[in-house]
Amino acid sequence: MGSLLFSWKGTQQKDVTIKSDAPDTLLLEKHADYIASYGSKKDDYEYCMSEYLRMSGVYWGLTVMDLMGQLHRMNREEILVFIKSCQHECGGISASIGHDPHLLYTLSAVQILTLYDSVHVINVDKVVAYVQSLQKEDGSFAGDIWGEIDTRFSFCAVATLALLGKLDAINVEKAIEFVLSCMNFDGGFGCRPGSESHAGQIYCCTGFLAITSQLHQVNSDLLGWWLCERQLPSGGLNGRPEKLPDVCYSWWVLASLKIIGRLHWIDREKLRSFILACQDEETGGFADRPGDMVDPFHTLFGIAGLSLLGEEQIKPVSPVFCMPEEVLQRVNVQPELVS
């Protein structure tokens, strides 16, 4: 597999070539085995070096196992004890024991506990107070006490509170104003007002607007066109112009299109072929691109992307929360999407 510049309608684009012998069927059992064994290898270099994002790693692994109907293979009690140990006095939750709390890992922990129907393991009132404390006067959210502002954190805040049934704990109107101020002329969203549109930020902002019932504020046709332009001749999707395709954008772009009701605008079969080509036939798991090293992050978003494409072997996934739809139905959290 190599990258190349591909001429498409007169414009050169970065893309990848997919070999003729690339996998074209879903290797579900291998992926389940890969994830089940990943967390057990606690002395591996890769495992040790990912401690700084452990909570999100647990979320990726559990969610993809649940989507594949394999959640029972994970160590529930060990995970619940770990999450409880990561909650700080301020209410926030950290990536790992001894690390600083952050909104990203607080959301991951709440998603995990929602999967397991075990939110009672943590002090919910303190989590709510922590999220409240990070909202600024303009409605934006910092990720932690150090103050970085990003629309990702706006999404983390409302997603966390929605799962806990506490969305009214923040100033929702001001939060909406801030996110809308990050909308660009091309229909997309950036991390702050005036920042470049990016598929990851668009997912966070459309997800935020779905949770807060504000999708009518989005120009779905304009944004849908920008998102569809992310598809390359290989079938893969990139996050912004002039970038290579990456399996994770099979989630960020595809989920955004689903939220705004424009999923049918892309070539679904070519995208499906690209995602399947990113599997490792020997070890299981998905990589960012065909032939690269696999990891739990891309494995979740490859499987979740296939779910949005209607893969029958995978449970239906929520495009807003990246969790099984059945879990969101159980907790009665069902954001309204554009039809």
From Swiss-Prot:
<feature type="binding site">
    <location>
        <position position="249"/>
    </location>
    <ligand>
        <name>geranylgeranyl diphosphate</name>
    </ligand>
</feature>
<feature type="repeat" description="PFTB 2">
    <location>
        <begin position="76"/>
        <end position="117"/>
    </location>
</feature>
<dbReference type="InterPro" id="IPR045089">
    <property type="entry name" value="PGGT1B-like"/>
</dbReference>
<feature type="repeat" description="PFTB 1">
    <location>
        <begin position="28"/>
        <end position="69"/>
    </location>
</feature>
<keyword id="KW-0597">Phosphoprotein</keyword>
<comment type="function">
    <text>Catalyzes the transfer of a geranylgeranyl moiety from geranylgeranyl diphosphate to both cysteines of Rab proteins with the C-terminal sequence -XXCC, -XCXC and -CCXX, such as RAB1A, RAB3A, RAB5A and RAB7A.</text>
</comment>
<feature type="binding site">
    <location>
        <begin position="249"/>
        <end position="252"/>
    </location>
    <ligand>
        <name>geranylgeranyl diphosphate</name>
    </ligand>
</feature>
<feature type="repeat" description="PFTB 3">
    <location>
        <begin position="124"/>
        <end position="165"/>
    </location>
</feature>
<feature type="binding site">
    <location>
        <position position="298"/>
    </location>
    <ligand>
        <name>Zn(2+)</name>
    </ligand>
</feature>
<keyword id="KW-0637">Prenyltransferase</keyword>
<feature type="binding site">
    <location>
        <begin position="198"/>
        <end position="200"/>
    </location>
    <ligand>
        <name>geranylgeranyl diphosphate</name>
    </ligand>
</feature>
<comment type="subunit">
    <text>Heterotrimer composed of RABGGTA, RABGGTB and CHM; within this trimer, RABGGTA and RABGGTB form the catalytic component B, while CHM (component A) mediates peptide substrate binding. The Rab GGTase dimer (RGGT) interacts with CHM (component A) prior to Rab protein binding; the association is stabilized by geranylgeranyl pyrophosphate (GGpp). The CHM:RGGT:Rab complex is destabilized by GGpp. Interaction of RABGGTB with prenylated PTP4A2 precludes its association with RABGGTA and inhibits enzyme activity. Interacts with CHODL.</text>
</comment>
<feature type="modified residue" description="Phosphothreonine">
    <location>
        <position position="11"/>
    </location>
</feature>
<keyword id="KW-0862">Zinc</keyword>
<dbReference type="InterPro" id="IPR008930">
    <property type="entry name" value="Terpenoid_cyclase/PrenylTrfase"/>
</dbReference>
<protein>
    <recommendedName>
        <fullName>Geranylgeranyl transferase type-2 subunit beta</fullName>
        <ecNumber>2.5.1.60</ecNumber>
    </recommendedName>
</protein>
<comment type="similarity">
    <text>Belongs to the protein prenyltransferase subunit beta family.</text>
</comment>
<feature type="repeat" description="PFTB 4">
    <location>
        <begin position="172"/>
        <end position="213"/>
    </location>
</feature>
<keyword id="KW-0808">Transferase</keyword>
<dbReference type="InterPro" id="IPR026873">
    <property type="entry name" value="Ptb1"/>
</dbReference>
<dbReference type="GO" id="GO:0018344">
    <property type="term" value="P:protein geranylgeranylation"/>
</dbReference>
<dbReference type="GO" id="GO:0004663">
    <property type="term" value="F:Rab geranylgeranyltransferase activity"/>
</dbReference>
<feature type="binding site">
    <location>
        <begin position="240"/>
        <end position="243"/>
    </location>
    <ligand>
        <name>geranylgeranyl diphosphate</name>
    </ligand>
</feature>
<feature type="repeat" description="PFTB 5">
    <location>
        <begin position="220"/>
        <end position="261"/>
    </location>
</feature>
<dbReference type="GO" id="GO:0005968">
    <property type="term" value="C:Rab-protein geranylgeranyltransferase complex"/>
</dbReference>
<dbReference type="InterPro" id="IPR001330">
    <property type="entry name" value="Prenyltrans"/>
</dbReference>
<feature type="binding site">
    <location>
        <position position="248"/>
    </location>
    <ligand>
        <name>Zn(2+)</name>
    </ligand>
</feature>
<keyword id="KW-0677">Repeat</keyword>
<dbReference type="Pfam" id="PF00432">
    <property type="entry name" value="Prenyltrans"/>
</dbReference>
<feature type="binding site">
    <location>
        <position position="246"/>
    </location>
    <ligand>
        <name>Zn(2+)</name>
    </ligand>
</feature>
<dbReference type="GO" id="GO:0008270">
    <property type="term" value="F:zinc ion binding"/>
</dbReference>
<dbReference type="GO" id="GO:0031267">
    <property type="term" value="F:small GTPase binding"/>
</dbReference>
<keyword id="KW-0479">Metal-binding</keyword>
<feature type="repeat" description="PFTB 6">
    <location>
        <begin position="268"/>
        <end position="310"/>
    </location>
</feature>
